[in-house]
Amino acid sequence: MSDQTFKQSMDLFHKTIAKYFPDRILELDILVAICASFFIRDISQPMALFLLGNPSSGKSTLLEIIKELPVILWRDNLTSAALLSASPNIAPEDQLLHQLEGKVLTIPEFAPLANNAQAKQIMPDFTRLLDGNAFVRHTGNGVIGTTEAQRFNMLGAMVRVSPKLWELVGNMGPRLVFIKLPDRQQSLDQTVTRLTKLSSKRSYTEKLEVARKIVLAFYENIAKYYPDGVTWNKEADDKDTIQKIAKLAVLVT
């Protein structure tokens, strides 16, 4: 490892991201933090966060930037059978349930699940998993699944939560957190100026590739700085901060 400190590594990460995606640094910080949360010991509760935003708001770009991280488990479509199947022809390791441990399940287009015929089965399944509970099914071939809770996180993106989708996810309560990406507030002249500069700068694909590399390098640095993980010192917790966190928890429940 170089003599670069963790703070210097973080500063370089922010500086590079600010160069190419200056209006999405905070949201990217949150996504990387969710991916890096596995380094913190004694966390057993899964986290689920969804990005909301209009087309071209950057939600898909944010997920694409972190796509190459080793903890990302990317899925474009989900079915109840894909999560856990009773078919004897499908090995346990090929089923999503047995791939979740230590991963961030990432669903870039979550809204289509609302139109999935099996959605009413999938959502209760994930409610149980996000509760940190074991997951088993009783079938004609016996009991399948796992008796151990899966430690995983979940990310997704959608334009908005439709009434139909809200009906499905509403019972999941505080297990889900939503971040609304603000629209770019630019005048016509500012928009024209931004668009005309695109031809003289790196292409979107090039910027995305640079961002992916810097995020991966930063994530790998976290692993180097904390090879044994991070043990939370609860005795050093600030009471005021704990109270603020508790108030926020009440707010989102």
Regions inferred by a protein language model and the residue ranges of each:
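Pre-Walker A adenine-sensing motif
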Residues: 29-42
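Phosphate-sensing "switch" segment of ASCE/P-loop ATPases
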Residues: 137, 145-150, 166-253
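Charged, amphipathic alpha-helical linker segments immediately N-terminal to NTP-binding catalytic cores
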Residues: 1-27
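Walker A/P-loop nucleotide-binding motif
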Residues: 41-62
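A short beta-strand-to-loop transition that corresponds to the Sensor-1 phosphate-sensing loop
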Residues: 108-111, 139-142, 151-162, 181-184
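Conserved catalytic/switch belt of AAA+ P-loop NTPases
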Residues: 38-39, 120-144
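AAA+/P-loop NTPase substrate/partner-engagement loops
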Residues: 52-57, 65-105, 111-116
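Conserved AAA+/SF3 P-loop NTPase catalytic/coupling segment centered on the Walker-B
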Residues: 101-130, 163-173, 188-189
